[in-house]
Design a protein with these regions (language model features):
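Glycine/serine-rich anion-binding loops at beta->alpha junctions
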Residues: 53-89
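Extended polybasic, low-complexity segments that bind anionic RNA or targeting/receptor surfaces
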Residues: 1-41, 45, 90-208
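Short coil/turn segments at secondary-structure boundaries
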Residues: 47-53
Length: 208
């Protein structure tokens, strides 16, 4: 399987062969689901905290005598029955982290790439962005006939892509990603995936 390599004007420069073991596998929906769940869970802060009746300040004194008032008996104003009292079984700080074997994580990425294979656009590089200006990136999007959510995978540290981050920063529908940060969530959310030729090679080497 192969893809055309385009310049940023949408003109064909050549072809690149995509590794079928990375871009042509049968998408495994279950493994992709597990990877997505892991990614979302691992992003959770897990710092929610509510105080129990033992942790709320005050409430040490019995509010009224046990008998003779006509009221229900009470031992503390910090009981969960009172406003301002402690919370029963409230949240406590905890880790939501989920582990996943490396082999399964790789399969999830391969599945996501294969599921998006038809929406992948390969460009040589972004050296045409000579200045960090939004209009240059907007022009490239128009030339490549892209729409919706666009995921751009490129090494923004490379000399030929040095202006890419600033040029794309003000376009809400464009998300930049380093090849090393490739993840299932961003791949599945994107309508188009734009990769540089170098990024394709880096991803292939990492996943095969």
């Amino acid at each position: 399987m192969s893809k055309e390599i385009l310049n940023t004007n949408g003109e064909k420069l050549g072809e690149i062969k995509l590794n079928a073991e990375v871009f042509g596998v049968e998408p495994n929906l279950h493994v992709m689901h597990l990877a997505l769940r892991r990614q979302l869970n691992n992003a959770r802060q897990g710092s929610a905290c509510a105080k129990t009746r033992a942790e709320v300040s005050g409430g040490g004194k019995k509010p009224w005598k046990q008998k003779g008032t006509g009221r229900a008996r009470a031992g503390s104003l910090r009981s969960p029955l009172f406003v301002g009292g402690g919370v029963v079984f409230g949240p406590k700080p905890r880790s939501f982290e989920i582990n996943m074997p490396q082999k399964a994580r790789k399969l999830a990425l391969k599945s996501a790439l294969s599921a998006r294979e038809e929406q992948i656009v390969v460009v040589k590089d972004f050296s045409a962005i000579t200045e960090p200006k939004t209009k240059l990136m907007a022009g490239i999007i128009k030339s490549l006939e892209l729409s919706g959510k666009i995921l751009v995978i490129a090494d923004t540290m490379a000399e030929e892509n040095k202006n890419l981050s600033l040029a794309a920063g003000n376009i809400p529908s464009v998300k930049l990603l380093l090849p090393s940060n490739l993840n299932v969530k961003d791949l599945l959310e994107a309508d188009f995936v734009v990769m540089t030729e170098k990024a394709v090679n880096v991803i292939t080497e990492r996943l095969q």
